[in-house]
């Protein structure tokens, strides 16, 4: 009887959790809250494969509802997700709608005044993962800059943040390191949705000249920062599941090192290591995968290392992975293969130096706290949803 009660409890817990996940709804799904704002206007849409309303793409939904969509802007990986990590995204036309597509991840990272000359309002709808160096945040910031320059409205259709239940990592404090993987004074795991960050960017004067754009955010429904949210569509080619999304804040720092994080395998951002690694029990051989991974580290070489798994959602970045790989790698001088890029990901040059000096994790984290506390005060002003505990 005891086992039956436990089983019933677990079933009930599963049903309640499933209902909560199902009940959450993106800003894009709240069509009654923004269709009226688009009526009789020429609309540009910043979107990718995650931009869905139910099972239909946002662009298709707008067109079938009589909204005049005149063009599409595509972020990293492209409008239909056809480009790999870091690959140049080209201009073109969408085969289904015949609409022109302008790349925001190539020769231009923001719409030009010419591109916006026949546009009244920009709609931004992209799923983010809540990490500073995920480039969709920089794309949104650049679109906001363009909206200021061209005096256009921007509507952000908000989406839940799967990593929005905690805040961690160093705050980006050195403007000299600003790049497309980080150009805001926020921590690596910022605990905000893109809608909240858009309000923060506007409110804190982080756009050029401390100007602000004409911004409307359409919030999600039934979402809190404690909510569990499982992404229905992978946000980018190398983040195929929730394990990779939870590991991403920690493992992406390895992109500035020589360590493989599983790019070119069936478990990207779910395993890491190098040839002849003495730590961990997993093994993998990175290979080129068209549209997903080009020239991955240690291509066609057998790597050994650690496979990532989570019994529960992580509540902080895992610095021990980075420290373990550094201590295990035989040639310390070559570990940080791209030190400048590592610093851009970290937001400062201090973390790299701390790892090299063997500073403890507690000591490293202590150096983050002052800036984190200041950020948390700013963040509270722009929250659209109940916060995590």
Please provide the spans of the model-predicted regions.
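Bacterial Sec-dependent N-terminal signal peptides
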Residues: 1-26
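Short internal beta-strands
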Residues: 70-77, 157
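Glycine-rich, charge-decorated loop segments at or immediately adjacent to ligand/cofactor-binding or catalytic sites
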Residues: 81-86, 155-178
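Glycine-rich oxoanion-binding loops at beta->alpha junctions
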Residues: 90-119, 131
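Glycine/threonine-rich flexible loop motifs
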Residues: 128-140
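Conserved anion/nucleotide-ligand pocket segment
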Residues: 177-248
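Glycine-rich, aromatic-lined ligand/substrate-binding cores of catalytic
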Residues: 221-299
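Conserved functional hotspot residues or short segments at active or partner-binding sites
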Residues: 268, 272-369, 387
């Amino acid at each position: 009887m005891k086992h039956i009660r436990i089983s019933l409890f677990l079933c009930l817990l599963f049903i309640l959790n499933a209902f909560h996940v199902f009940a959450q709804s993106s800003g894009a799904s709240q069509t009654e809250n923004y269709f009226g704002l688009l009526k009789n206007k020429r609309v540009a849409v910043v979107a990718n494969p995650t931009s869905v309303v139910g099972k239909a793409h946002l662009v298709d939904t707008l067109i079938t509802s009589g909204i005049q969509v005149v063009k599409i802007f595509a972020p990293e990986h492209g409008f239909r997700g056809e480009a790999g990590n870091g690959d140049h995204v080209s201009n073109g036309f969408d085969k289904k709608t015949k609409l022109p597509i302008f790349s925001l991840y190539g020769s231009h990272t923001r719409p030009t005044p010419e591109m916006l000359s026949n546009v009244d309002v920009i709609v931004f709808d992209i799923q983010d993962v809540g990490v500073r160096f995920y480039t969709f945040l920089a794309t949104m910031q650049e679109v906001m800059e363009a909206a200021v320059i061209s005096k256009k409205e921007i509507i952000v259709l908000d989406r839940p943040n799967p990593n929005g239940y905690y805040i961690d990592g160093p705050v980006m404090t050195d403007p000299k390191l600003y790049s497309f993987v980080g150009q805001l004074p926020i921590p690596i795991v910022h605990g905000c949705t893109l809608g909240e960050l858009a309000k923060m960017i506007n409110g804190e004067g982080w756009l050029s000249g401390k100007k602000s754009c004409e911004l409307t955010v359409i919030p999600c429904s039934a979402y809190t920062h404690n909510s569990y949210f499982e992404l229905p569509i992978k946000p980018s080619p190398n983040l195929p599941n929730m394990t990779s999304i939870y590991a991403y804040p920690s493992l992406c720092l390895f992109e500035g090192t020589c360590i493989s994080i599983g790019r070119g395998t069936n478990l990207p951002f779910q395993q890491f290591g190098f040839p002849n690694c003495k730590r961990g029990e997993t093994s993998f051989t990175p290979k080129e995968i068209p549209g997903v991974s080009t020239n991955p580290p240690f291509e066609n070489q057998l790597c050994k290392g650690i496979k990532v798994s989570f019994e529960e959602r992580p509540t902080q970045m895992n610095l021990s992975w980075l420290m373990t790989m550094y201590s295990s790698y035989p040639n310390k001088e070559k570990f940080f293969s791209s030190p400048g890029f590592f610093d851009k990901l970290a937001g400062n040059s201090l973390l790299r130096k701390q790892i090299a000096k063997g500073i403890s994790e507690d000591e490293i984290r202590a150096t983050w706290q002052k800036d984190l506390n200041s950020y948390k005060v700013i963040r509270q002003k722009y929250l659209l949803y109940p916060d995590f505990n």
